[in-house]
């Protein structure tokens, strides 16, 4: 686009945002009538619809809407149709004092020569895209990118010149850096009067809360006993030092008493921790009232009904949308919200998110989660500090021990958080239900959850890594940062319904959430839609019934290593029965089996090994150039409801490598691929002896080749990472899988034969 036309377009959009409608009309009309750039013309016409509608010239707004209906782009047609319906029903112009934020949105399938203003026409491989943020206000058109409700869209790099262009205009706040495509919100209504839902059975949640406490206690006890034993063994081997007799004692009783005490004092200790680590501060109710009056009313009404004091309100100065609750009793509960959530959600959405936290308090699961946070937060901080210490050490001979120590601490943190994965998933279903019943607005919760995912992904893209806050507080937040990666960035290329079809239609979907901290987003939203339909409401998302096309054989092959374990038990039983018969017939005396039942362990390892070997070829097929998928195919891969990780789709994608740098990412736990279609998690295994480290490529444009896998969290197993300069990193997933299978086979055979 010529520079003067681009300047006029920008000036017109800025004038529209500021309410200078006549100036906006004067700037946009020449561009709207121009045929030199189709995308800019559509952009200007959308702006003119809003400008004419806001200035009271409804007939002209209708005329431009009718022109837009004839567009070849279906999204433009849908928007223009809704705008025309609104304008034709309108009897008189509304007062200009009533303002609703809207934004221009991305029109998919634009031709390459119709380049968005914010995108250079010939971006290079390493080039960073320009940024443009546009925000307009209008009251006379249907909501596009969230229209007064969504206050944030994602940041993403522009697609390569050969890819379909998307990323037109979006409703954003000044805190957001870039535009990311179309997000269409139906703004489905809330219930004005509703019947109470059937009371859920809380016994599973209660039992799981108790089980989580027991699991946490057991893991901590074993770690403590291991540490105590290691210290004493070290002291024994050192000269002139004696082991500490205290460390030979059983720590069970002391640890149990300590955990009970920690639950009681957790609110005050977490106040100190969050204030010192993340800058948490008090959040006056009056300030919350400026963001969401309904949230204050919900808190006051619910607490009054249950005879609770109002929870203490806190705020975190972070741009990522976060909310969590901690405490030991309803009277000392704290609800912590981030500044980003207050800025990115609408009034009713903030209110229902606060209502979900009241659900955690009502169900008492927040007490166990508070204890978990109190234990894991210092552990995560120690991991962070040791990692930073390792980054300061220049000599490799000293850096390696620190790196190993940081990795061990990270492993301990993962073990501790792993004790609460099941509770973290289940409790969200209960809190969603409570929030919907309190407010009568399940559709607002659907929008809120999706916008939180969008905001979290935007924060990761802006920071180009996963922040410490997102990682350490993940278990207590309503949306996981892992599930936000693809969900929060795919909106311009794929509808939410299409992306979430896997979550609702795949018959084996729940098997892939075992190691996830949060339930499937599509499953949560489908339950909220059921509540909305129960109250005779239209739903924010419409999930069509999709027949299952998943082959059972594919799923069995997917879990072959784990199926090998029960098969190993059957094999052990067969061996034992065979021995009994041989012994009874005085044919053979396998005394080593009779006296030592450890042979069962050997059978389990052998079964696991056989299952792993059976799966390797299907899990890591040869990547052939003729069948490799590129960036354009990523939305289709994400929307396939019948996909399983075993499908192993070969991909070759161009984009940017994101993640933390330094010791804290030595295990490649924070590797994210940013393409024109969104964010995808990467799995990488370091290969000893490589001259190039994966951290050397973070922040650079790369080409990733590997196997795309659709699970609860989509990811890519890396085969190679390449740069424009020719540097290549190999990730030996097949080799390591083979090594694991051989090691398990050898170990199992040794145990089986020797006992």
Question: What spans do the regions from the language model cover?
Answer:
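Active-site recognition of the HExxH zinc-binding catalytic motif
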Residues: 337, 352-360, 364-365, 428-432
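Short pre-active-site segment immediately N-terminal to the catalytic Zn-binding motif
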Residues: 287, 339-352
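Post-HExxH zinc-binding segment in Zn-dependent metallohydrolases
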Residues: 375-397
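Active-site-proximal gating segments in proteases and membrane effectors
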Residues: 310, 315-331, 388, 392-396, ...
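Active-site scaffold of zinc-dependent metalloenzymes
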Residues: 323-345
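Catalytic Zn2+-binding segment of zinc metalloproteases
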Residues: 358-374, 441-443
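Hydrophobic or amphipathic, alpha-helical segments that drive membrane association/targeting
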Residues: 2-34, 42, 56-57, 63-113, ...
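An active-site-proximal "capping" alpha-helix that borders the catalytic cofactor pocket
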Residues: 271, 299-303, 424-445
């Amino acid at each position: 686009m010529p520079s003067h036309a681009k300047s006029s377009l920008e000036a017109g959009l800025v004038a529209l945002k500021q309410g200078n409608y006549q100036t906006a009309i004067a700037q946009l009309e020449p561009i709207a009538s121009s045929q030199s750039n189709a995308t800019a013309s559509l952009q200007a016409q959308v702006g003119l619809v809003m400008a004419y509608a806001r200035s009271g010239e409804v007939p002209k707004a209708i005329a431009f809407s009718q022109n837009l209906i004839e567009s070849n782009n279906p999204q433009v047609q849908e928007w223009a149709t809704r705008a025309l319906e609104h304008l034709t029903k309108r009897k008189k112009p509304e007062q200009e004092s009533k303002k609703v934020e809207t934004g221009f949105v991305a029109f998919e399938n634009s031709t390459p020569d119709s380049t968005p203003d914010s995108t250079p026409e010939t971006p290079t491989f390493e080039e960073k895209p320009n940024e443009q943020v546009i925000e307009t206000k209008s009251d006379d058109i249907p909501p596009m990118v969230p229209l007064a409700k969504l206050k944030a869209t994602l940041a993403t790099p522009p697609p390569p010149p050969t890819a379909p262009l998307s990323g037109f205009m979006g409703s954003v706040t000044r805190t957001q850096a870039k535009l990311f495509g179309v997000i269409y919100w139906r703004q489905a209504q809330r219930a004005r009067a509703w019947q109470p839902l059937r009371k859920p059975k809380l016994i599973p949640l209660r039992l799981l809360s108790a089980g989580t406490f027991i699991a946490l206690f057991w893991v901590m006890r074993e770690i403590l006993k291991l540490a105590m034993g290691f210290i004493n063994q070290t002291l024994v081997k050192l000269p002139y030092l004696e082991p500490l007799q205290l460390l030979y004692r059983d720590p069970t009783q002391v640890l149990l008493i300590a955990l009970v005490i920690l639950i009681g004092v957790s609110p005050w200790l977490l106040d100190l921790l969050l204030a010192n680590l993340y800058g948490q501060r008090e959040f006056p109710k009056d300030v919350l009232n400026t963001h969401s009056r309904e949230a204050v009313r919900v808190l006051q009404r619910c607490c009054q009904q249950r005879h609770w004091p109002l929870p203490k309100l806190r705020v975190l100065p972070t741009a990522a949308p976060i909310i969590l609750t901690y405490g030991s009793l309803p009277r000392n509960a704290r609800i912590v919200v981030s500044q980003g959530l207050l800025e990115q959600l609408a009034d009713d959405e903030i209110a229902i998110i606060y209502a979900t936290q009241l659900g955690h308090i009502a169900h008492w699961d927040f007490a166990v989660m508070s204890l978990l946070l109190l234990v894991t937060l210092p552990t995560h901080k120690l991991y962070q500090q040791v990692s930073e210490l390792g980054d300061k050490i220049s000599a490799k001979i000293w850096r390696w021990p620190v790196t190993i120590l940081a990795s061990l601490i990270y492993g301990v943190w993962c073990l501790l958080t792993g004790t609460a994965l099941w509770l973290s998933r289940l409790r969200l279903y209960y809190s969603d239900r409570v929030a919907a019943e309190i407010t009568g607005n399940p559709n607002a919760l659907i929008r809120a959850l999706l916008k939180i995912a969008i905001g979290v992904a935007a924060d990761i893209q802006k920071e180009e890594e996963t922040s410490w806050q997102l990682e350490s507080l993940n278990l207590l937040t309503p949306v996981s940062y892992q599930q936000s990666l693809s969900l929060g960035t795919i909106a311009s290329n794929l509808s939410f319904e299409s992306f979430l079809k896997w979550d609702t239609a795949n018959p084996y979907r729940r098997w892939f959430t075992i190691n996830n901290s949060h339930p499937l987003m599509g499953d949560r939203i489908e339950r909220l839609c059921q509540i909305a339909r129960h109250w005779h409401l239209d739903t924010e998302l419409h999930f069509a019934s999709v027949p299952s096309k998943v082959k059972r054989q594919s799923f069995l092959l997917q879990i072959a290593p784990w199926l090998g374990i029960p098969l190993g038990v059957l094999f052990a039983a067969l061996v034992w029965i065979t021995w009994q018969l041989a012994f009874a017939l005085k044919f053979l005396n396998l005394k080593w089996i009779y006296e030592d039942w450890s042979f069962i362990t050997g059978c389990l390892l052998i079964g696991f090994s056989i299952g792993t070997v059976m799966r390797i070829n299907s899990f890591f097929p040869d990547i052939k150039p003729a069948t490799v998928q590129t960036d354009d195919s990523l939305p289709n891969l994400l929307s396939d409801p019948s996909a399983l990780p075993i499908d192993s789709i070969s991909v070759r994608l161009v984009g940017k490598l994101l993640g933390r740098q330094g010791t804290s990412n030595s295990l490649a736990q924070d590797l994210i691929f940013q393409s024109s279609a969104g964010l995808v998690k990467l799995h990488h295994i370091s290969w000893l002896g490589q001259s190039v480290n994966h951290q050397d490529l973070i922040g650079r444009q790369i080409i990733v080749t590997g196997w795309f896998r659709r699970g609860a969290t989509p990811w890519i197993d890396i085969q190679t990472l390449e740069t424009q300069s020719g540097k290549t990193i190999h990730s030996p997933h097949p080799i390591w899988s083979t090594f694991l299978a051989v090691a398990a086979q050898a170990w199992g055979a040794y145990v089986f034969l020797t006992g």
